[in-house]
Amino acid sequence: MKLTCMMIVAVLFLTAWTFATADDSGNGLENLFSNAHHQMKNPEASKLNKRWCKQSGEMCNLLDQNCCDGYCIVLVCT
């Protein structure tokens, strides 16, 4: 019983240690915020201005509702 408890504690500790010391090589949020700040200063170079949505008559995704102006009905933007 003690061995089982020790094993459970060890696994939990190692899991927590792995998440706490994981290296974010892409520097995720920091990189995202600096890019967004740069794009606000230079809106012509901004990728945020490019629309990801679908125009009327194009195929769409029912779950995301990715139509620009209307709604996604039967997988086609209206």
Swiss-Prot record:
Organism domain of life: Eukaryota
Location of this chain's protein in the cell: Secreted
Cystine connections: C53-C68, C60-C72, C67-C77
Signal peptide start-end: 1-22
Transport recorded as keyword: no
Gene Ontology terms: cellular component: extracellular region
Matches recorded under SUPFAM superfamilies: omega toxin-like
Annotated keywords: Cleavage on pair of basic residues, Disulfide bond, Ion channel impairing toxin, Knottin, Neurotoxin, Oxidation, Secreted, Signal, Toxin, Voltage-gated sodium channel impairing toxin
Organism of origin: Conus textile
InterPro entries: Conotoxin (IPR004214), Conotoxin_d-typ_CS (IPR012322)
Residue(s) carrying Methionine sulfoxide: M59
Entry annotated with the keyword Transmembrane: no
More details: Veratridine increases the rate of dissociation in a dose-dependent manner.
Major localization listed first in the record, in broad terms: secreted
Pfam families reported in the protein's UniProt record: Conotoxin
Described function: Delta-conotoxins bind to site 6 of voltage-gated sodium channels (Nav) and inhibit the inactivation process. Binding of this toxin is strongly calcium-dependent but not voltage-dependent. The binding site is most likely on the extracellular side of the sodium channel. Binds receptor sites on both mollusk and rat central nervous system, but despite its high affinity binding to rat sodium channel, it has no functional effect in vivo and in vitro on it. Also has no effect on Gambusia fish. Is important in mollusk for the paralysis of the prey.
Residues that make up the propeptide removed upon maturation: 23-49
Reported tissue expression: Expressed by the venom duct. Is present in all duct parts with a highest content in part 4 (distal part near the pharynx).
A GO MF label: toxin activity
Domain note: The presence of a 'disulfide through disulfide knot' structurally defines this protein as a knottin. The cysteine framework is VI/VII (C-C-CC-C-C).
Protein name: Delta-conotoxin TxVIA
